[in-house]
C-alpha cells in the first residue's frame, strides 16, 4: 500500500509511521507522473489518495470516500462530445466497485459551479484512478472537505488544509490496522 498526497500541508511522511507516503505536487500531470513512478518502482497492490477537496453539495462535509472519478475540465464540446467525456474513449467515468461519492478532477481551483456536476472537486484523483485502473491496481480515495467550491473557497482551503489529517489517520488505522 502506498499513499499519494499532493502537499505536505495535507499529510507528512512522518504522520503514519511504517506506511509509505509520497508527495506528488498539485494537478493531474504531477499526479500522473508520481503514480507511474510509484507503480514502476514499487508494484503496489493498492494506492490510496488522500487530500482536500471542495464540495458542490452543502450537505457533504468532513472526511469522505470518492469512488467515481470524472475529468471535469475535458471539453471537446465543439466535436459534439459532452463536457467531461474524453473523445474516442469507451467510458468517461472511472469506478472502483465501492459505494462512495463522485469526484470531478481538473487543473483549476474551483470557486464557482463547474459545468460537470459531481459531489466533490479536486485536482489529482482522476489521473491516479485512471492509471491504477489501466494497471489493475486497487485504488481508494479519501478527501477532506476543505471548502464549498464557492467565492470563499481559496480562503476556506487555506484555513482547513491541515484539518483532515487526524481523521484520515484514524480511518487508515480503522481499515488497515
Regions found by a protein language model. Name each.
Residues 1-2:
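Extreme N-terminal starter segment of soluble prokaryotic enzymes
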